[in-house]
Amino acid sequence: MTVRFGLLGAGRIGKVHAKAVSSNADAVLVAVADAFPAAAEAIAQAYACEVRTIEAIEKASDIDAVVICTPTDTHADLIERFARAGKAIFCEKPIDLDVGRVRECMKVVEETKGKLMVGFNRRFDPHFMAVRKAIDDGKIGAVEMVTIISRDPGAPPVDYIKRSGGIFRDMTIHDFDMARFLLGEEPVAVTAHASVLVDPEIGKAGDYDSVSVILETASGKQAIISNSRRATYGYDQRIEVHGSKGVVSAENQRAVSIEIANGDGYTRPPLHDFFMTRYTEAYANEIASFISAVEKGTKIAPSGADGLAALALADAAVKSVAEKRQVRIDA
């Protein structure tokens, strides 16, 4: 079976997914829709697909699945529409910035027996997958503590920050999902701290640029997350999992893996400059996983429930900062 795709949204992340779909032997990109015709046309020319409206893709009999890469405030409505249309759905995170709206959306997906995958691409990074495999294989015993460091080379434009939902819902949400993925238990308590250390304009926009979070599970396991909108040395992405019998870690990746030693000392190439190059394989792997699940009718993960859980943690972190206390997660 070849899964036939429609792409909704032809912006930066839409281009990433267009490439991932078109590069997969079990998929074909049939059509693209975007509010800006020139953006849609560029993808259509690059991947030999058609430009259609969202309505046409929704009704199309030659499309099995859609990838939603539109602005966040359109995600939930589009998920509901395409679930009712019987299409399998891959949606970039988050489903919505409001937990209540996400729950409403999930009811529609459940009622229609829809297939929904949420784009937490880091689960599909080969290095992070190897960390999870080491845990599953018992190499480090029982997981006790997870440490996640995620720092961007620079802050996004303030206009973006104003509509992003804030750093916890926009940036840390990836790390909330990764913490759940590695802990093996649901966090029940969140303690967060946040500052404006990078750009005062971010603070004026009502957000933070430097945050730390501690998640705790009912059994006492912990995940410690460190985020910053500044890393002068490149895109900083590290994970460590400490267990009862050892530790496993994934270090920063570089575009070229060489090391030079001479009279001037040791030198290595710089880190990747941002997520599109650092997570190239992850984007391809997540689409491949989605395609496989659609073809075989197997369980899809990360699911809508995973998206909801990560957003609930983000909301708890926002509340923790505002009220300067630990926040419990509702069951």
How would you describe each model-predicted region?
Residues 107-115, 129-143, 242-243:
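Basic phosphate/pyrophosphate-binding loop/patch that engages nucleotide-derived ligands
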Residues 53, 90-91, 116-118, 147, ...:
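Hydrophobic residues in well-ordered beta-strands that form the structural core
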Residues 158-222, 228-233, 305:
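Rossmann-like dinucleotide-binding domain that binds NAD(P)(H)
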